[in-house]
């Protein structure tokens, strides 16, 4: 079972930074995850939330500010933001990046950046339109469906996504076996428990193995490393 480091943040390595991605690209980690979205002036930033509220105590949406306004707001709380172009220039590890594409519209300038990127991306898409755009130049084992609804997997499989993401708290209604039977090549599960959130737990990873998951997204890279050592993966 593949382990994917999800939006990791550690002391000295803020989330969605090159430092956090390179820290997370540890032995045994299959891919590292980050997010990209569009600012109001059409720039592409590596940033998870749709607003600045959680990180900068600023309620403005990312889509409603310029890149410079975003940088100023984050600088007030000693944070920064990088662009997609900076990521593809500065990331030096060989571990693939699972790029969660928050935009559902396949803007031509965004797709062009994807197509010429010098790093290995696994594209995580939320819409069939974005899936169709990246499918033109991306093998299906490098396209993951971050589908908004648990019942949408047939559409994403039909569109050419090779990997389907499920949430851990969906598993009482939908299982990897069900999604495999519908034609998915791989099913990855996003850890999510009331106690640990998306950090993940050894118990969850053990369970995912028993239900035939092909991968798991975890935020606690140290826990993942210990689990891999225990299972002889590293």
Q: Where are the language model's segments positioned?
A:
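Phosphate-group recognition and catalysis centered on beta-loop-alpha active-site segments
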Residues: 1-234
């Amino acid at each position: 079972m593949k382990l994917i480091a999800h939006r990791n943040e550690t002391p000295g390595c803020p989330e969605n930074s090159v430092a956090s991605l390179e820290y997370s690209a540890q032995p045994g980690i299959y891919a590292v995850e980050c997010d990209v979205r569009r600012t109001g002036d059409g720039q592409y930033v590596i940033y998870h939330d749709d607003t600045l509220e959680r990180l900068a105590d600023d309620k403005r949406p990312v889509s409603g500010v310029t890149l410079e306004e975003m940088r100023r707001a984050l600088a007030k709380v000693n944070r920064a933001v990088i662009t997609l172009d900076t990521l593809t220039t500065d990331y030096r590890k060989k571990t693939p990046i699972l790029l969660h594409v928050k935009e559902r519209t396949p803007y031509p300038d965004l797709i062009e950046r994807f197509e010429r990127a010098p790093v290995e991306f696994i594209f995580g898409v939320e819409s069939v339109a974005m899936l169709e755009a990246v499918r033109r130049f991306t093998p299906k084992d490098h396209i993951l469906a971050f589908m908004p609804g648990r019942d949408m997997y047939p559409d994403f499989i039909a569109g050419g996504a090779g990997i389907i993401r499920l949430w851990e708290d969906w598993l009482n209604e939908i299982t990897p076996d069900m999604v495999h039977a519908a034609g998915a090549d791989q099913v990855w599960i996003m850890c999510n428990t009331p106690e640990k959130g998306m950090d993940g737990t050894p118990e969850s990873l053990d369970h995912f193995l028993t239900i035939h998951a092909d991968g798991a997204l975890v935020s606690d890279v140290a826990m993942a490393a210990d689990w891999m050592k225990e299972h002889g993966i590293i």
